[in-house]
Amino acid sequence: MANSYQIIDEKAWERAMHCAVFRNSVEPAFCVTFEADITNFRLMVKEEGLSFTLAMVYAVCKCANHIEAFRYRFVDGQVALYNKIDTAFTYLNEDTGLFKVVNVPMLDDMKEYCELAAKTAKEQKVYFTGPLGNDVFSDNLWKN
């Protein structure tokens, strides 16, 4: 799923100081937790016959892609800005009770994404396809 990116000139970059602080972190990640009223979203997903979980992965990652700061990564020690970030999510294998990590490219259409994600998750036989790529979002959804 290798997406294209551009290398950032850190000398002229307004985020250079912040980058220097976190550059050597074990996992320089950005985590956000928030409450959201998803009543209308749930209704729409149900009407469309989509998986709630896959639709939410799509929606969160679609929004995150619109925020430039969330698309920065380190590539070979340099700061890179990706044109887009794909998705990675966990999916429970109901036969074994074990989860697998599924990588799915981000698409423009939610229904197409959900169909591809469901197909990919169902057909993927291995639990891990390798280390997570540098160009993915992974969200953890909690619904009350």
Can you name each region flagged by the protein language model?
Residues N3-I8, R23-A55, R73-I85, N144:
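Gly/Ser/Thr-rich phosphate-binding loops and adjoining beta-strand/alpha-helix segments
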Residues F70-N103:
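Small-residue-rich loop/turn and linker elements
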Residues D37-F41, C63, L92-T96:
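Generic structural motif
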Residues V57-C63:
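Structural preference for long, well-ordered alpha-helical segments in enzyme cores
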Residues W13-H18, R23:
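Basic, often amphipathic N-terminal segments
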Residues C63-F70:
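Short alpha-helical functional segments enriched in proximate histidine and acidic residues
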Residues D95-N144:
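Helical lid/core segments from catalytic subdomains that handle acyl or acyl-like groups
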